[in-house]
Amino acid sequence: MLVLLPPSEGKAASGRGAPLKTGSLSLPGLTAAREAVLGELVELCAGDEEKAREVLGLSEGLRGEVAKNTELLTAGARPAGEIYTGVLYDALDLASLDAAAKRRAARSLLVFSGLWGAVRMTDRIPSYRCSMGVKLPGLGALGAHWRAPMAEVLPEAAGDGLVLDLRSAAYAAAWKPKGEVAARTATVRVLHAPTRKVVSHFNKATKGRIVRSLLATGTAPEGPAELVEALRDLGYEVEAEAPAKGGRPWSLDVLVHEVH
């Protein structure tokens, strides 16, 4: 099983250990594309601060994120599982999982990123600010920048098992599974049952809980149909729609009755 996650916008502080080594990250086929974004991002943020803030879509209160990006090559790196914070990652609570569940997380979780493309939880990265919606002056829109290298690398990473896609729209646009990989993919929405609407905070929290449940129990569905049954067994209310045509993902709605 491969689980595709969005990053968090806010991040924990960089570590005090060794700095980033791009060549040591998972999915080495993305190295050149990573280094291209990294180089331009550092250069942008080392220049005119107001321009960098505008390009990155940062408010006045997030001005300090520009300076943080200038230190990406020298800041101490930490495992991505410690860098990403926020609602989804708080609900996942990776640090509190037992050793076996952490090993499953290391194998199966892939976090998408405007800067790194995609990283595993054990990949050591510095704290950064660069969303997939950013359009860098030289490289252009990052979503478009990542499509070709992702298309080369990720089908192999997906293997022959289930792909559980929990990404938000901007990150989903960077790689869309195709063909037989798409047929093994399930996308998930979390809906407030009375209104049938997505509530952002609870959507993220529920997705984090779903991933935690799968990891903690060692549940490894072989495909989308098995995922539906597994989630129901774990206590989730799930509505599923199989694709009308082959080579397309399944669509799953997880219904929640209390928003908290």
UniProtKB/Swiss-Prot annotation:
GO biological process, alphabetically ordered: response to hydroperoxide
UniProt GO cellular component terms: cytosol
InterPro entries noted in UniProt: YaaA
Coiled coil: none
HAMAP family associated with the record: UPF0246
PANTHER family (alphabetical): PEROXIDE STRESS RESISTANCE PROTEIN YAAA (PTHR30283:SF4), PEROXIDE STRESS RESPONSE PROTEIN YAAA (PTHR30283)
Protein name stated in the entry: UPF0246 protein SCO2297
